[in-house]
A protein has these predicted regions:
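Flavin-dependent oxidoreductase catalytic cores
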Residues: 1-366, 370, 375-381, 385-386, ...
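SH3/SH3-like beta-barrel fold
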Residues: 558-562
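Surface-exposed acidic, glycine/proline-enriched linker/cap segments
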Residues: 169-170, 347-357, 412-413, 474-482, ...
């Protein structure tokens, strides 16, 4: 099952051709059931720009494009409908947000308007209206989002429902709006279409819904006799989002206790979710009786053919999700359309695939990091004969180093997946072979793609004779072994500094991380890693110092400056580990370009040797370079 998740593909409140292509790719790839992203049921619900306005009749033609595309492959598709309630802002709607009680959401920090009885009736009618639009648009069923971000969740939760009328108080009264919505939607869609409810099993907040109450809600839903299945979730999107879309720091199947408990209490089919990245994990959850269906979202974002490969016994060919959250969850939080670090097709399904090359060419790729390997895959996919040359002993580039950190080991699946694809395409990879311009000319390929990565830059404040100043890469590759008092300098704001800080703390070092930013590893918030990093850092005694620049280093000490005030002081440090921007390793590319037209092969470059960035840029750029040949 391809469960509901945000995509940010909507335009002006309407579904797009990209929606149709995106969902069709998963239907073609064997998904047994698709549930779309949420569709808003009322004008007061517009928490983010690219939300589908299901309450507006003009969405129906777009719905039909989606359902027709999916039905071509025999796959049923449901629409999820929702009102986010107080977990929102009036920024886009220019209206007050509606909720059970006037409680300010911890993320949006906007006090909601407590809905009166007439407004509750308006919301219920909005669900029915939107469900009717979905039926007219060809959807096979409706899922009511009542879990991690929903006005219904707000009513169900004792933490956000402070009412003392018939919609507040005990659980049955708090569930009244849910049962009214169920009845109204069932009446709107008729008896032949499916109706599901997605419930939050544990909000993980003080005074919130717990698993025991969630089980009772499931019983109430079943007793209504109008619902066909129950889907599950964990956490609250604006308080404990890091538990809903868990990164690699949280084990697969972590939320299975929720469907397991609900399944014991009801006869309805129950859906389980929670970082299922491998078919074997899903099969085990089913075999052990935790649930009746498995929702796999990021796994099918990473590989649209996940289900078909699993069904045909080719599970080893699946491009496993990294659970890195960089291009899926991370892009959503930045109001960008959904993508994937390792699947350059995600978000571009509506763009035509590259056609086979007119003539087979001999292509040399220099560098076997994510950019070089993806370039090789793309070029070979067009029919070219491809060889990859890697200077080091092992493919992987900076990803291989990042995966050395135990808590980041799954990131190495990016390279494992690429190497498996290279093997299937017959790409030759030679390691331990440094290549210069003369070697390229001697090999005489028709085209060369330079993907030589980046090199560490030494900060201006670190003189060459300061032997105790090293780069994070030297720590990861083992060429430097800092110990004692270690100062880690974070000028990148991502996993570079935090991963090495943890690694050194685990080895017994006394670690302090200093950053010019307001928080250490500031972009960890985008990938939902910040909360877990802070917990682990505190447990390991890692000191975090913010708003500070390093201005000098001397034996045994480092000078810091608090940039808001200009105050300077010295801290003791035996070693300084730098996580600072790198420089492109572009010499080979420049040498080849300097040969001039006709004096050498066609030359392209990709990845960090263009400009040092993160893995997603390397993969996308590698794909483009390979497709250009």
């Amino acid at each position: 099952m391809f469960a509901a998740h945000l995509t940010n593909y909507a335009e002006d409140g309407h579904p797009t051709e990209q929606h149709a292509a995106y969902y069709e790719a998963r239907a073609r790839g064997g998904a047994g059931l698709i549930i779309t992203e949420e569709h808003s049921v009322h004008p007061t619900d517009w928490p983010y720009e690219k939300l589908i306005h299901g309450f507006d009749e003009s969405v129906i033609p777009g719905y039909r494009r989606i359902t027709e595309a999916v039905h071509r492959h025999g796959t049923p598709i449901f629409a999820q409908i929702n009102h986010n309630g107080g977990q929102a802002s009036g920024m886009y709607s220019r209206l007050p947000v509606w909720a059970a009680s006037p409680v300010a959401d911890p993320m949006f920090r906007e006090v909601a308007k407590e809905v009166d009885h007439a407004e509750i009736a308006e919301i219920v009618a909005g669900y029915a209206l939107t469900a009717g639009h979905c039926v007219r648009g060809g959807f096979d069923g409706i899922e009511l989002q009542c879990s991690h971000s929903s006005i219904v969740r707000g009513f169900l939760s004792p933490a956000t429902n402070l009412r003392d009328d018939e919609y507040g108080g005990d659980l049955r009264r708090r569930a009244r709006i849910l049962l009214e919505i169920v009845a109204a939607v069932r009446d709107a869609i008729g008896p032949r279409r499916a109706l599901g409810v997605r419930l939050c099993g544990d909000e993980l907040i003080a005074g919130g819904t717990t698993i025991d109450e969630a089980v009772e809600v499931a019983r109430l839903v079943e007793s209504a006799g109008q619902v066909d299945y129950i889907n599950t979730s964990i956490g609250v999107a604006t308080s404990t989002l890091y538990m809903i879309e868990a990164s690699m720091h949280i084990p697969p199947g972590y939320a299975l206790f929720i469907p397991s408990a609900i399944r014991k209490a009801v006869e309805l089919p129950v859906v389980g979710v929670g970082r299922f990245k491998d078919p074997l994990q899903a099969e085990r959850a089913l075999a052990e009786g935790h649930c009746d269906l498995i929702g796999v979202v990021r796994g099918q974002i990473a590989d649209a053919d996940f289900a078909a490969k699993a069904r045909s016994g080719h599970g080893d060919d699946i491009r496993l999700c990294l659970s890195c959250n960089q291009e899926c969850v991370g892009r959503m939080g930045l109001n960008r359309w959904l993508g994937c670090v390792e699947n350059p097709r995600t978000g571009r399904e509506s763009v035509a695939l590259a056609s086979p090359a007119r003539a087979r060419r001999r292509v040399m790729v220099v560098g076997a990091g994510p950019a070089g390997l993806q370039a090789a895959i793309a070029a070979a996919g067009r029919g070219h004969q491809v060889t990859v040359h890697e200077r080091g002993d092992t493919p992987g580039g900076q990803v291989r180093l990042a995966a050395i950190v135990p808590s980041r080991a799954e990131f190495g699946d990016l390279i494992r997946n690429q190497l498996a694809e290279c093997a299937r395409l017959g790409i030759t990879i030679t390691c331990g072979s440094g290549v210069d311009a003369a070697a390229v000319r001697a090999a005489a390929p028709d085209a060369v793609i330079v993907a030589t990565g980046a090199v560490a830059e030494r900060p201006y404040w670190a003189p060459a004779e300061a032997a105790q100043v090293v780069d994070v890469r030297q720590v990861l590759d083992g060429s430097a072994a800092p110990a004692g008092r270690v100062l880690v300098v974070d000028e990148i704001g991502f996993h570079h500094a935090t991963s090495v800080a943890e690694l050194l703390a685990d080895r017994g070092a006394q670690v302090e991380v200093v950053t010019p930013g307001m928080v250490v590893g500031q972009d960890l918030g985008i990938t939902l890693d910040m909360e877990n990093w802070c917990v682990r850092a505190a447990a390991k005694g890692i000191v975090q110092t913010t708003d500070c620049l390093v201005t000098g280093v001397a034996p045994g000490s480092v000078t810091l400056m608090h940039h808001p005030t200009g105050r300077s002081w010295q801290v003791a440090a035996d070693w300084v580990v730098c996580a600072v921007p790198a420089a492109p390793a572009e010499q080979l590319y420049l040498d080849l370009k300097a040969l001039g037209p006709g004096a050498g092969p066609e030359v392209h470059r990709a990845g960090d040797c263009v400009a040092p960035r993160r893995a997603h840029a390397a993969v996308i750029e590698g794909q483009r370079a390979g497709e250009a040949l």
